[in-house]
C-alpha cells in the first residue's frame, strides 16, 4: 500500500509563485512543496546546479527563470533569485499549522561537512559561519562570496531563521555544494507535516 508523503497537504498543493522585474533583472520563480520536475535557467551554470540541489534535496518542484545584467556582475541576478525564492517559500508555507517548523541537516560531500538548521519562525535571521577555502573565489562565472548574499536575500523574504556552519572542507566546490544541500535537507524537514497544530505556544507564526 502506498503511504502518503509526510509533506502532503490534502488536495491543494502548497505552492508559491513570484515575478520580479527591475532595471537590473527579470526573475520568475514557482515553487511547490512536493517532488517533481524542475526547470532552472539563470545564465550562471554553477548557480543553476546549486538551485537544482535545493529542488532535489528539498523535495521541491522548482521553476526559476532569470535574466540579469551579467555583463556587469552576477550579484543582482543571484540576490534577486534569492528574493524570489524566499517569497515563493513564504507563500507556500503561509499556513504553518501542522508543519514540523524545525529542520536540521548535516551533509558531507567527500572531505567537506556542512550543518544547516532551519526554523520557520516568521522572523528573518541568517548566521553564516563559513570559512571558505582560500586561493580561489570563482567557480566558473559564479563568485562564491555571493552564496551568503543569496541566503540572506532568501531568508529575509522567506522570513525564516537559518544557521549554516561549515565544519570543514578543502575543495571549494564541495563546500559550496554541501551548503546548498544541507540547507535543502533542513528545509525539507522543517516543511514536513507532523499533525494539525500550529507549532508555536504563541498561537502565531
From Swiss-Prot:
One of its GO terms (cellular component) is cytoplasm. SUPFAM superfamilies: Ribosomal protein S5 domain 2-like. It is found in: Cytoplasm. It is an enzyme of class 4 (lyase). It catalyses: D-erythro-1-(imidazol-4-yl)glycerol 3-phosphate = 3-(imidazol-4-yl)-2-oxopropyl phosphate + H2O. Residues 1-27 are annotated as: Disordered. Pathway: Amino-acid biosynthesis; L-histidine biosynthesis; L-histidine from 5-phospho-alpha-D-ribose 1-diphosphate: step 6/9. Keywords: Amino-acid biosynthesis, Cytoplasm, Histidine biosynthesis, Lyase. Its EC number is 4.2.1.19. PROSITE patterns: IGP_DEHYDRATASE_2. One of its GO terms (molecular function) is imidazoleglycerol-phosphate dehydratase activity. Belongs to the imidazoleglycerol-phosphate dehydratase family. This is Imidazoleglycerol-phosphate dehydratase. It holds the Pfam family IGPD. Transmembrane segments: none annotated. GO terms for biological process: L-histidine biosynthetic process.
Amino acid at each position: 500500500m502506498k503511504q502518503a508523503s509526510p509533506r502532503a497537504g490534502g488536495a491543494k498543493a502548497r505552492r508559491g509563485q513570484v515575478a520580479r522585474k527591475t532595471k537590473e533583472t527579470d526573475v520568475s520563480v514557482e515553487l511547490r512543496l512536493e517532488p517533481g520536475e524542475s526547470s532552472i535557467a539563470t545564465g550562471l551554470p554553477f548557480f543553476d546546479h546549486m538551485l537544482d540541489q535545493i529542488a532535489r534535496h528539498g523535495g521541491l518542484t522548482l521553476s526559476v527563470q532569470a535574466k540579469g545584467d551579467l555583463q556587469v556582475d552576477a550579484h543582482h541576478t543571484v540576490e534577486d533569485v534569492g528574493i524570489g525564492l524566499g517569497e515563493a517559500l513564504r507563500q507556500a508555507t503561509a499556513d504553518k499549522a501542522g508543519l514540523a517548523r524545525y529542520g536540521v541537516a548535516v551533509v558531507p560531500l567527500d572531505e567537506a561537512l556542512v550543518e544547516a538548521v532551519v526554523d520557520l519562525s516568521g522572523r528573518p535571521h541568517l548566521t553564516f559561519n563559513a570559512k571558505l577555502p582560500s586561493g580561489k573565489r570563482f567557480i566558473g562565472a559564479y563568485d562564491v562570496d555571493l552564496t551568503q548574499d543569496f541566503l540572506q536575500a532568501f531568508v529575509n523574504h522567506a522570513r525564516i531563521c537559518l544557521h549554516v556552519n561549515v565544519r570543514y572542507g578543502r575543495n571549494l566546490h564541495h563546500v559550496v555544494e554541501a551548503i546548498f544541500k544541507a540547507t535543502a535537507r533542513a528545509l525539507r524537514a522543517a516543511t514536513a507535516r507532523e499533525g494539525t497544530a500550529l507549532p508555536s505556544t504563541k498561537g502565531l507564526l
